[in-house]
């Protein structure tokens, strides 16, 4: 399943202080007209931040202290990563996404370095 479409928008921002911030959305989000639209917007995004530590086997762990979904608050989110030039590939390690309770899955997200 392509949760956020073929060309999602987003940023993964590591800071010098050891914090990681991630936001990812569907590209064609529209302003909501009603409560149903608001719910669709919530389901079409992901955002979290926390202290991050890199492990020695190409994995990192984020201790989440703020998130778009309360289920991720105060959790550890572990990701595998691979760097190839300006491309960072990040994959989940078998997780349950809060928008899909009871279903375990894996995601791979590719981030390209920007000059901004």
Which stretches of residues belong to each language-model region?
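Lipid interaction determinants
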Residues: 1-47, 54-116
């Amino acid at each position: 399943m392509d949760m956020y479409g073929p060309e999602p928008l987003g940023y993964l921002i590591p800071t010098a202080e050891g914090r990681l911030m991630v936001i990812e959305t569907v590209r064609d989000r529209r302003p909501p007209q009603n409560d149903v639209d608001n719910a669709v917007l919530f389901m079409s995004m992901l955002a979290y931040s926390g202290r991050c530590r890199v492990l020695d086997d190409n994995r990192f762990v984020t201790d989440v202290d703020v998130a778009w979904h309360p289920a991720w608050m105060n959790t550890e989110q572990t990701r595998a990563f691979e760097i190839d030039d300006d491309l960072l590939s990040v994959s989940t390690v078998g997780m349950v996404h809060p928008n899909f309770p009871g279903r375990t899955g894996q995601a791979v997200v590719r981030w390209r370095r920007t000059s901004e």
